[in-house]
C-alpha cells in the first residue's frame, strides 16, 4: 500500500519479494509505509546511516532505514548500514525481556479517534504491562509553538534547495539537470508527462528561498529543533521519568485518488516529532483492521537506536502480529472491501 516515498520498499518487504528493503525518510516515509504494509520499519537517529547517493530533501531530517519482516531483520540491516568508528552490534543488543521494569510513556494525545485502532492500541499496551512495564500516561502535546507548522515547512524548503543543488552538481556529466532551477525548467518543458497529475508548486517555493545563512531559515530551524528535542522528546522522557515513548504508528491507509487527492482519516501517531528531532523511531505490526495493517511505535532519545530496536523486538516476540501476504489484483478484491461494496456485512 502507498504511504510516503518508500511505499515500494514497504510493499516489497510485505509481499516477501525481499527479506528486507531500504526506505528513506524525511518525515514519515519509513514509518508510514511500514505501518500501512504491516512490516517493521526503523528510522535511525539522523546521521547514523550515510546519505551518500540518496536524493536529499532535508539535511536535518533525512535518513535511510530498514524495512523488514521482523525486528531481527532490521537489526541485521542496521549492522550493515550504520556508520562510525564505534559500531554497535544491533543484533546482539536485542533483548526479548527489554520491557521488564521499564517506564513507558503513553502519548495519549496522539491516539486519534479511530475506535478500531484505539482498541488494538489498548491490547498492545496490555502486552507491555504483562511484560513487566509500567505505563505512564502523557496527555498533553509538548509542541505548543503556534508557528510550528509554518516553521517546519520553511526549513524543508530552504534545505531542499540547498541540498538538491549540491546533489545535482555532484552527479555525472550525463545528468543534464544540475540544479533545482533546471529540474523545474525540465518539468515545464515536459509538462505532459512530468506535470500530468501533480504541479511543482513546492519546487517553485523552494527555488525562491535564499541560502542556509538566511536568518529566517536559522530562526525557523532552531525553533523546530528546540520544540521537538529539548521541549519535545527530551522533555517528555525527563519530566515523566520514562525510558521510551509509545503511540499508534498511524491510520489505516486510504484509497489513492490521483484526481481529487487521497483522503486521510483522522491521523493518529506522533512520528513527526521524532522525524523533525532526528531521533530513533520503530514501528512494529500490532494487528489489522478490515485486512489493513496498523503498527505500534516506540520512540526514544538521540542515539538510543539499539534500545529502541530492542523495545520493538520485545514487543514483537510477545505479539507476532505481522500478517502473511495475500495477493490480490486490486484493493477491491479484499474480502472486507468487496463485501462492503456489495452492501454486505462479512461474517
Can you annotate each of these PLM segments?
Residues 1-78, 276-288, 292-297:
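Short glycine/serine-rich loop segments
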Residues 133-151:
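Short connector loops at secondary-structure junctions
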Residues 98-105, 157-228, 283-293, 342-344:
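Short helix-loop capping/hinge segments that flank enzyme active sites or metal/cofactor-binding pockets
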Amino acid at each position: 500500500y502507498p504511504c510516503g516515498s518508500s511505499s515500494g520498499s514497504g510493499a516489497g518487504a510485505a509481499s516477501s519479494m525481499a527479506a528486507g528493503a531500504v526506505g528513506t525518510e524525511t518525515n514519515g516515509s519509513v514509518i508510514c509505509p511500514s505501518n500501512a504494509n504491516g512490516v517493521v520499519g526503523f528510522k535511525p537517529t539522523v546521521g547514523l546511516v550515510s546519505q551518500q547517493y540518496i536524493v536529499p530533501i532535508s539535511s536535518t531530517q533525512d535518513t535511510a532505514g530498514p524495512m523488514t519482516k521482523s525486528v531481527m531483520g532490521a537489526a541485521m540491516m542496521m549492522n550493515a548500514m550504520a556508520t562510525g568508528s564505534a559500531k554497535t552490534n544491533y543484533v546482539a543488543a536485542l533483548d526479548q525481556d527489554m520491557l521488564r521494569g521499564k517506564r513507558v510513556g503513553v502519548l495519549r494525545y496522539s491516539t486519534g479517534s479511530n475506535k478500531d485502532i484505539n482498541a488494538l492500541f489498548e491490547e498492545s499496551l496490555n502486552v507491555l504491562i504483562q511484560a513487566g512495564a509500567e505505563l505512564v500516561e502523557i496527555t498533553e502535546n509538548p509542541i505548543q509553538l503556534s508557528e510550528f507548522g509554518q516553521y517546519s515547512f520553511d526549513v524543508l524548503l530552504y534545505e531542499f534547495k540547498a541540498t538538491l543543488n549540491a546533489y545535482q552538481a555532484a552527479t555525472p556529466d550525463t545528468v543534464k539537470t544540475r540544479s533545482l532551477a533546471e529540474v523545474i525548467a525540465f518539468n515545464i518543458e515536459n509538462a505532459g508527462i512530468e506535470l500530468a497529475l501533480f504541479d511543482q508548486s513546492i519546487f517553485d517555493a523552494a527555488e525562491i528561498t535564499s541560502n542556509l545563512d538566511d536568518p529566517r531559515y536559522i530562526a525557523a530551524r532552531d525553533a523546530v529543533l528546540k520544540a521537538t528535542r529539548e521541549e519535545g522528546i527530551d522533555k517528555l522522557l525527563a519530566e515523566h521519568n520514562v525510558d521510551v515513548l509509545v503511540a499508534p504508528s498511524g491510520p489505516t491507509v486510504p484509497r489513492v485518488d490521483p484526481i481529487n487527492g487521497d483522503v486521510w482519516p483522522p491521523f493518529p501517531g506522533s512520528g513527526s516529532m521524532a522525524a523533525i528531532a532526528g531521533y530513533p523511531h520503530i514501528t512494529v505490526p500490532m494487528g489489522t483492521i478490515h485486512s489493513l495493517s496498523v503498527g505500534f511505535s516506540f520512540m526514544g532519545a538521540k542515539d538510543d537506536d539499539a534500545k529502541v530496536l530492542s523495545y520493538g523486538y520485545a514487543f514483537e516476540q510477545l505479539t507476532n502480529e505481522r500478517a502473511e501476504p495475500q495477493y490480490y489484483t486490486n484493493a477491491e478484491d479484499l474480502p472486507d472491501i468487496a463485501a462492503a461494496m456489495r452492501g454486505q456485512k462479512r461474517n
